[in-house]
């Protein structure tokens, strides 16, 4: 049996081909899985569970089919969809996980996280994250009208794009690569904090398997891939794990 782990789909009405790939994945490759974990950024934007979205409706229905069939579904919010709440979770049939958290995968304790917590060189983003994850901010934000929330999300996205464009112009993208990737010291600190030998995260869109030494322990960090030019899924079973790519339709 296999556990399937994905992240960074960034589902958006403007990229319907990715939505179709994900729905096909759910139809054809999920039946019989031990569990499915979605580690954030399932959606490109989420401004509250009352947000009208045909894409979100189709995804919820497809996920619910597997939940009703007995497959455990888990969702960890990302930086794009951290406002996914209990109402949508109930519709889709998944359990919302804290970021980070430790799960047992076939006898191997594994720390799961979206991954943005490890990108501490991006000081501007970490400040924005701290502000927008504050419970008081969230409660106040969700009382605003849909149009006001959408305007805030659009402004935040434009600011993010401008920030990243500025980084790319410095030192031939060297600064961009550094700031948007994880900080090794933070990775080591998280391994030390949780006392596990395996970590799985997304966010950076740099799929790979990394091996490192932490306090004389050999640890593995698995980085999930995004769903832009292809799909990406991590398959984990009792024998190990493998990162697989899914081809876009057409």
Curated annotation (Swiss-Prot):
Chain ranges passing through the membrane: none
Keyword Amino-acid biosynthesis on entry: no
Record's cofactor remark: Binds 2 Mn(2+) ions per subunit in a binuclear metal center.
Domain of life: Bacteria
GO molecular function, one term: manganese ion binding
Cofactor: Mn(2+)
Main location: membrane
Pathway: Glycolipid biosynthesis; lipid IV(A) biosynthesis; lipid IV(A) from (3R)-3-hydroxytetradecanoyl-[acyl-carrier-protein] and UDP-N-acetyl-alpha-D-glucosamine: step 4/6
UniProt-recorded name of the protein: UDP-2,3-diacylglucosamine hydrolase
Species this chain originates from: Xylella fastidiosa (strain 9a5c)
